[in-house]
């Protein structure tokens, strides 16, 4: 039995609230159960040095947690003077995932930055950030079209992410914190609306996992992610 009384293949309640803040070109509050993340998309003219003159855009991300997003206060990374390895890893994951949504050439030499701020953490913050940022980014691109910064809305491939893992010997979908801390295996899966995998990150925590368990976890992701993409489209 899962702590939340969910079935092994059941997502937490997921909501996506668009236009959550006033100033960003795209803004979303995404909620996976008690995990809540604000995802703001900002358009900035120009691209990183390695892309200058190539007439294509760039998509990048920043990620952070508020001090009381967790059960006890966590010191802000800014006060420490540097970002931690976990934060850098998550930022890169979000950026890679979102760059799979569109052909970067349609952006011209513009950069979209996704700021993902966790206001409450109960497991799956990075997967929630990816899922919410996809919607925020689409709204930001629509903003670019409205202001004639690009000619037309490009083909947009929705991307979503979910956690899967082995909890008490059973593969489960969308782990909350109570499950995550006891999971024998923890995996994050990113897929697009065609059902193709973009990224799979899996780690054995206490016990190694076999091919059958791996397949079971991927199958659970294939159940959950289409549901998330449907929620994205209906937001």
UniProtKB/Swiss-Prot annotation:
<dbReference type="GO" id="GO:0009022">
    <property type="term" value="F:tRNA nucleotidyltransferase activity"/>
</dbReference>
<dbReference type="GO" id="GO:0008033">
    <property type="term" value="P:tRNA processing"/>
</dbReference>
<dbReference type="InterPro" id="IPR015847">
    <property type="entry name" value="ExoRNase_PH_dom2"/>
</dbReference>
<dbReference type="GO" id="GO:0000175">
    <property type="term" value="F:3'-5'-RNA exonuclease activity"/>
</dbReference>
<dbReference type="GO" id="GO:0000049">
    <property type="term" value="F:tRNA binding"/>
</dbReference>
<feature type="binding site">
    <location>
        <begin position="124"/>
        <end position="126"/>
    </location>
    <ligand>
        <name>phosphate</name>
    </ligand>
</feature>
<dbReference type="GO" id="GO:0006364">
    <property type="term" value="P:rRNA processing"/>
</dbReference>
<dbReference type="InterPro" id="IPR001247">
    <property type="entry name" value="ExoRNase_PH_dom1"/>
</dbReference>
<feature type="binding site">
    <location>
        <position position="86"/>
    </location>
    <ligand>
        <name>phosphate</name>
    </ligand>
</feature>
<dbReference type="InterPro" id="IPR050080">
    <property type="entry name" value="RNase_PH"/>
</dbReference>
<dbReference type="GO" id="GO:0016075">
    <property type="term" value="P:rRNA catabolic process"/>
</dbReference>
<keyword id="KW-0819">tRNA processing</keyword>
<keyword id="KW-0548">Nucleotidyltransferase</keyword>
<dbReference type="InterPro" id="IPR002381">
    <property type="entry name" value="RNase_PH_bac-type"/>
</dbReference>
<dbReference type="Pfam" id="PF01138">
    <property type="entry name" value="RNase_PH"/>
</dbReference>
<keyword id="KW-0694">RNA-binding</keyword>
<dbReference type="Pfam" id="PF03725">
    <property type="entry name" value="RNase_PH_C"/>
</dbReference>
<dbReference type="InterPro" id="IPR020568">
    <property type="entry name" value="Ribosomal_Su5_D2-typ_SF"/>
</dbReference>
<keyword id="KW-0808">Transferase</keyword>
<comment type="subunit">
    <text>Homohexameric ring arranged as a trimer of dimers.</text>
</comment>
<dbReference type="InterPro" id="IPR027408">
    <property type="entry name" value="PNPase/RNase_PH_dom_sf"/>
</dbReference>
<protein>
    <recommendedName>
        <fullName>Ribonuclease PH</fullName>
        <ecNumber>2.7.7.56</ecNumber>
    </recommendedName>
</protein>
<comment type="similarity">
    <text>Belongs to the RNase PH family.</text>
</comment>
<keyword id="KW-0698">rRNA processing</keyword>
<comment type="function">
    <text>Phosphorolytic 3'-5' exoribonuclease that plays an important role in tRNA 3'-end maturation. Removes nucleotide residues following the 3'-CCA terminus of tRNAs; can also add nucleotides to the ends of RNA molecules by using nucleoside diphosphates as substrates, but this may not be physiologically important. Probably plays a role in initiation of 16S rRNA degradation (leading to ribosome degradation) during starvation.</text>
</comment>
<dbReference type="InterPro" id="IPR036345">
    <property type="entry name" value="ExoRNase_PH_dom2_sf"/>
</dbReference>
<dbReference type="InterPro" id="IPR018336">
    <property type="entry name" value="RNase_PH_CS"/>
</dbReference>
<keyword id="KW-0820">tRNA-binding</keyword>
């Amino acid at each position: 039995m899962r702590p939340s009384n969910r079935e092994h293949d059941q997502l937490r309640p997921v909501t996506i609230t668009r236009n959550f803040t006033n100033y960003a070109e795209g803004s979303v509050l995404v909620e996976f159960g008690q995990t809540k993340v604000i995802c703001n998309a900002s358009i900035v003219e120009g691209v990183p040095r390695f892309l200058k003159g190539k007439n294509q855009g760039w998509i990048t991300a920043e990620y952070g947690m508020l001090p009381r997003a967790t059960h006890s206060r966590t010191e802000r990374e800014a006060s420490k003077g540097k970002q931690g390895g976990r934060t850098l890893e998550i930022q890169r994951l979000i950026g890679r995932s979102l760059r799979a949504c569109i052909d970067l050439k349609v952006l011209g030499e513009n950069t979209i930055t996704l700021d993902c701020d966790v206001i409450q953490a109960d497991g799956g913050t990075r997967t929630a950030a990816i899922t919410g940022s996809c919607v925020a980014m689409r709204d930001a691109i629509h903003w670019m079209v409205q202001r004639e910064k690009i000619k037309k809305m490009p083909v947009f491939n929705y991307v979503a992410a979910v956690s899967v893992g082995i909890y008490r010997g059973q593969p489960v979908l969308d782990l909350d914190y109570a499950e995550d801390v006891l999971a024998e295996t923890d995996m994050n899966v990113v897929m697009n609306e065609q059902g193709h995998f973009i990224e799979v990150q899996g780690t054995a925590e206490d016990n190694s996992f076999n091919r059958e368990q791996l397949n079971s976890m991927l199958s659970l992701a294939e159940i959950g992610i289409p549901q998330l993409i449907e929620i994205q489209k209906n937001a």
